[in-house]
């Protein structure tokens, strides 16, 4: 079985943002030359996520609001994790909800998505 591994790095200027990385992943797939199989995309940072959904701004705002309602950033003291001196207890919980990775079928050298599906790093 052939495999290919490449790391992609993203700088996210805000505490929470959703970046469409579909083109980046597609570029890696093309570089790999793999025509059939599976493509695993995972976040290698403990408070980052990778997920598949629609690239629609209103939906992304809904996600941000919903996640903040589930695990508000403040008050920072509400999270036992933050006793370590960090302030990201909420981000760990949000990542758990959004997920660490996605797997996409590769068919004919292309990412095999359903309608509207895109890959996001958040």
Model-identified regions with their sequence ranges:
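Active-site histidine-anchored catalytic micro-motif
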Residues: 1-122
């Amino acid at each position: 079985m052939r495999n290919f591994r490449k790391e992609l790095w993203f700088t996210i200027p805000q505490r929470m943002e959703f970046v469409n990385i579909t083109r980046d992943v597609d570029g890696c797939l093309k570089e790999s030359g793999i025509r059939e199989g599976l493509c695993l995309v995972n976040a290698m940072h403990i408070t980052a996520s990778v997920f598949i959904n629609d690239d629609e701004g209103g939906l992304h705002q809904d996600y941000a609001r919903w996640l903040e309602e589930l695990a508000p950033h403040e008050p920072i003291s509400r999270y036992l994790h933050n006793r370590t001196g960090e302030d990201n207890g909420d981000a760990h919980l949000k990542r758990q909800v959004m997920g660490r990775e996605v797997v996409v079928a590769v068919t004919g050298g292309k990412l095999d998505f359903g309608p509207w599906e895109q890959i996001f790093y958040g």
